[in-house]
Amino acid sequence: MSYMIATPAALTAAATDIDGIGSAVSVANAAAVAATTGVLAAGGDEVLAAIARLFNANAEEYHALSAQVAAFQTLFVRTLTGGCGVFRRRRGRQCVTAAEHRAAGAGRRQRRRRSGDGQWRLRQQRHFGCGGQPEFRQHSEHRR
């Protein structure tokens, strides 16, 4: 079975990258509109006029398709960033980056419990980060 772990930071970075790619493609398409849809017949005969119409029709289809792709790309970026926001709101305080975790001293917190033989022992804790993946903090236990 495959698992996918995504953190809000990774989703935000992916959305930013995808948005940048979409912007670059949109600029290139806008620059190409005039050159691709305004093909003129090279001569006065019917064959060259038909070829020019064919190129213009293909260019118009391409630009219509690229507009649909741009709309999908915009929706995809919104979905990524919106999903990240929902994830952050639902996780609340538990959703912190690893750096914030370390800065807060979460790795140094220890809980003790009384074992069956009356000795106090350190207990291993699970801390869940933004990705939903347990981060195990291992503490040494001396067993007799």
From Swiss-Prot:
Under the heading SUPFAM superfamilies, the entry gives: PE/PPE dimer-like (SSF140459)
Keywords from the named record = Cell wall, Secreted, Virulence
Q: Name one GO cellular component term.
A: plasma membrane
Subcellular localization: Secreted, Cell wall; Cell surface
Q: Which residues form the PE domain?
A: 1-87
Where is this protein chiefly located?
Answer: secreted
Per the record, which residues fall in region Disordered? 98-124
Q: What does this protein do?
A: Together with PE10, induces macrophage apoptosis through human Toll-like receptor 4 (TLR4) signaling pathway. Interaction with TLR4 leads to increased levels of phospho-IRF-3, increase in the transcript levels of IFN-beta and pro-apoptotic genes, up-regulation of IL-10, down-regulation of IL-1b and enhanced levels of macrophage apoptosis.
Complex formation: Forms a complex with PE10. The complex interacts with human TLR4.
What's the protein here called? PE family protein PE9
